[in-house]
């Protein structure tokens, strides 16, 4: 188990570094003589036609609606595995991170609403600071090396998992356009076939992908965000191969997708969405209630919500601190959870459709994430060093 966790954290750390480089590259290109090339790249028309079916979108939409569906598919696979055999399979293990995640989503939203209450047209962005980017958060935590207790890493991952569940529900419930009942019906008709494949222990991925693609197209046309098709499809991938119990179709697929998602899809998403032109930008734009509310939600709301819920649950006797940790370290993790980059950018696109005249929500996302990441790293670096000196050691998962 220790080796699996170590491999996972190393993978996420590397992915976080590549993600950061892609975001930096996007900002450099967007503020260089290559700006026009960047704009033409993300807005280049891409048309796919199969018979009478025509899907015409620009590259930006194909990345956000198409490639990100693969990311959400991987998220769905991870959620299913964690619920069946992982950290979420034991109710005693999930109370604290679940409560922390709820607090860490409600408080940032309230902070954002407080800054934008007098502007109803801006309230659509309330969910932007509610998200946590696990790749960046784990990447930052991994910079501290072996001093970090594995229980603290697991706590952070568990919060991020519940955060993903919350983000998926938010997108499904609050960021949908006018619904097409016919498209929803077609998407719904795929579910019995997927269920039948699962019950018959079909382990080949091709039949699932066939119905998954049909469902994705139907959901795309329905008004619900198409990436949710990826989550739904993941729930039907079998965890166990009854003919070969040593191999898990779900875990094999999860392993195969990790590299593609971490080192191709997410960096491409970051490159296509983080290209903020700073020409003409100043404190006035940064202090606009939308980006400022997002930054405050990520930095202030996240830590307040997570710490308040964690403290309340522990004081109520419903849970205890993760082994080998203390409240200072939990506070450091709450700061890292303010790194909302990927999912925040994604929800921002749904809420405002990109850059809006007079403000750019991405400024708040990047500023809030940077401040949260640096503050979390500095605090954990100091507290873990202090705790190591007083004899607190990392949890040994090999026992």
Swiss-Prot record:
Entries under Pfam families matching the protein: Na_H_antiport_1
Main localization category: membrane
Reaction(s) the record says it catalyses: Na(+)(in) + 2 H(+)(out) = Na(+)(out) + 2 H(+)(in)
Membrane topology: Multi-pass membrane protein
InterPro entries: Na/H_antiporter_dom_sf (IPR023171), NhaA (IPR004670)
Compartments it resides in: Cell inner membrane
Any one GO cellular component localisation term in the record: plasma membrane
A biological-process GO annotation: regulation of pH
Stretches of the chain forming a coiled coil according to its record: none
Entry keywords, A to Z: Antiport, Cell inner membrane, Cell membrane, Ion transport, Membrane, Sodium, Sodium transport, Transmembrane, Transmembrane helix, Transport
GO molecular function: sodium:proton antiporter activity
Role description: Na(+)/H(+) antiporter that extrudes sodium in exchange for external protons.
Family: Belongs to the NhaA Na(+)/H(+) (TC 2.A.33) antiporter family.
Protein name (record): Na(+)/H(+) antiporter NhaA
Organism classification: Bacteria, Pseudomonadati, Pseudomonadota, Gammaproteobacteria, Moraxellales
